[in-house]
């Protein structure tokens, strides 16, 4: 586990640099053994738009080239580059700001689960409009977790 952390700690700034040159952001990076194979999973985000397959290909190629040269991982591995997805987690206040108007599911620390459109945000509050039209406002600190819902 310590070795995995060292690899991620060395790789993270390189990945962030690659992404920033492309106008992208790092959403998550993990390295773990899955079914006897080592999987390096890099999740990227485009703060202005959705991540395209082409962007994933470019990032994968650049990270792969770096890993080949740096020889950070001494065994065979699988590199996966993807986006957070349509039902992406909402982890920071900036995520709620970005997705005003979108359908979300939000779990509050008091056990309530809310599903509705993100109506409005302030510096530290989120307002969500439920299907019945009721608007509920709560502080970001009250949120346990949240994610976008796919709206059909």
From Swiss-Prot:
Give the GO biological process terms.
ribosomal small subunit assembly; translation
Q: Which UniProt keywords apply?
A: Cytoplasm, Ribosome biogenesis
| Location of this chain's protein in the cell | Cytoplasm
State where it is primarily located: cytoplasm
Asked whether the keyword Cytoplasm is assigned, the reply is yes
Entries under SUPFAM superfamilies matching the protein: YhbC-like, C-terminal domain, YhbC-like, N-terminal domain
Q: Which family does it belong to?
A: Belongs to the RimP family.
What NCBIfam families does the database record attribute to this sequence?
PRK14638.1 (NF011231)
Q: What does this protein do?
A: Required for maturation of 30S ribosomal subunits.
Official protein name in the record? Ribosome maturation factor RimP
Q: Which gene encodes it?
A: rimP
């Amino acid at each position: 586990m310590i070795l995995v952390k060292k690899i991620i700690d060395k790789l993270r700034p390189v990945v962030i640099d690659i992404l920033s040159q492309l106008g992208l952001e790092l959403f998550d990076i993990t390295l773990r053994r899955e079914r006897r194979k080592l999987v390096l999973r890099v999740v990227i985000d485009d703060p202005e738009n959705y991540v395209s397959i082409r962007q994933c290909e470019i990032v994968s190629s650049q990270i792969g080239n770096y890993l080949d040269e740096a020889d950070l991982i001494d065994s065979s591995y699988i590199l996966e580059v993807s986006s957070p997805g349509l039902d992406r987690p909402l982890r920071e206040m900036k995520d709620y700001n970005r997705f005003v108007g979108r359908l979300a599911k939000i779990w509050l620390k008091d056990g309530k689960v809310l599903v509705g459109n993100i109506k409005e945000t302030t510096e530290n509050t989120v307002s969500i409009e439920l299907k019945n039209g009721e608007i509920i406002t709560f502080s970001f600190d009250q949120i346990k977790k949240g994610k976008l819902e796919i709206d059909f």
